[in-house]
Structures are given as structure tokens and as C-alpha cells.
Amino acid sequence: MKKFKYSEITPEKIYHKRRSFMRSISYGLGALTLSSVPLVNTKASNLNEPTSYDNITTYNNYYEFGTGKGDPHKRAKNFTTRPWNIKIEGLVEKPLELSIEEVLSIKSEERILKLRCVEGWSMVIPWLGFSLSELLNKVQIKPKAKFVEFETVYNPEEMVGQRYPVLNWPYIEGLRIDEAMHPLTTVVTGLYGKTLPNQNGAPLRIFIPWKYGFKSAKAIVKIRLTEKMPNTAWKNASPKEYGFYSNVNPEVDHPRWSQATERVIGESILAPRIKTLMFN
């Protein structure tokens, strides 16, 4: 996994000027053992100025609240996240339904990981969460299961973007089983040691550091184990542009733009782009 320098971490007043971000990086460094899953890049970073906490919470892709980057921050303020339950079902021996309180009772840790958007921008975020495998191990996955599907809540009354057919709602994403069980595939419940903001996917989302950001579903209500590859939202909308796997790869361009470089959010619009690293 890629190690970030302290100066590269997206700060909130330097994270209250007293937190050490690097303790979270040790998790998983010796645990990346699944040969079929790419390793997050470990080369030295060339990030410049860090982005701000304000940017993390005001510059978002979350089409359920609108297609503009500022729409989620403006429109998600009154989004209801309590009560909230999440179901784990499908090809499992022990289907499970957990309240958000039960999910939050699972021990979390800080994980400093870079989000790389398919649009060609990035930011480094200190997430709070735990490995998805901790949930999946509770349900005893059946041998036939090959994929894990994530489903976002459908609530057009509050998620105004769902009133329009921008995507096929509810939002669906998915992973192979081995990807889902990777220790760095994270159930995110917060950032900067705080509760996850609504515009960032509250009350819980998935984050997969070696994949483009759209693979990380937000406001999840169902996790389903399947034999067939899930019909994911963006693949369904434009299969030639947004593939199922969508690993960060500077050598494979999007049909409409290069993926060789990225813009660091928070830097000047005139700042040079940085090279994108394989698997982020």
C-alpha cells in the first residue's frame, strides 16, 4: 500500500494539530496476500499542497443529490440516516440484518487512503472504518458465490437526484469475492475521526483504494452475494466507458480523456497535474 508523508495528508486544521495519521498505514502492509487482487502502489508520492477538509466535504460526486460537485453538500444536509439497517443476503448460509448502531459497534481504525476519481482528480482522506470481510465472515458465504453486490438506499423524496433517470436507480456496484475480502476494502463510517458526513456517503459506504471512486457505493442498505456479475449502475449506463473492474490504471485511458495524470483537489487551477500511479 502507498505510504503518504504527513505533509501530504488532507488536513482539518492539521487534524486538530495532535493526531498522527500514520498509525493506520501499518494495517494491511503485511496482509496484501491475495495474488488476484492488485496491490496499492507503494512508490513515493509527488503530491504538492494538501487539499482541505472543506474540499473533502464540498467537492463530491453523488448523483443521488445532483450532478454538480457542490450539490451533495447543499442538498444532503437533511438526509435521514437514522434509523438505518443494512441487510446481507443472497448466497449465504446465515442472512443478516444489522442496525447502523450494530455496525458502528465494530471496532474502527483510521485508514489514510487516496481517492482517485475516474474524471481525473484525487484527494487523500483519513477514513474511519473496518474491513468489509468482518461483515462477510458473519454470514458464511456459499461456495457458489462469486461476486458481492452493493445497493444504495432508494429515497427520491430526500435524494432529489433519484427523481431523474440520470442512472438506473437504486445505485448498484459490485466486486469479486476476493476483492471484497481484501483487508483494504473498507466499510467507511467516518472521516477525520468524526461521523461520516451525509454528502460523503453516510451512514456507511464502501471504499476500495485501487479502484476509481465510482466503485465505492454510498449510503448502503443491502450487500448481496451472487453467482453472476452484478449489473452495476455506471456499467449499465455506459459499458464502453465504465467497466466492472475499473482499477486505477494510467495506461488505460477513458474513451474521452487520458488517465495518465490527475488533478489534486485544492491546488491552484494552474498547478501542474501529477502522474497517476498504477493501482493508485
Where are these regions (language model features)?
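Basic side chains
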Residues: 18-19, 23, 205
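N-terminal secretory signal peptides
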Residues: 1-20, 34-35, 41-43
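Surface-exposed flexible segments
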Residues: 31, 37-39, 219-225
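Functionally constrained cores in energy, signaling, and assembly domains
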Residues: 16, 27, 38, 50, ...
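Structured, non-membrane catalytic/scaffold regions adjacent to prosthetic-group chemistry
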Residues: 44-280
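Sec-dependent signal peptide hydrophobic core
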Residues: 25-33
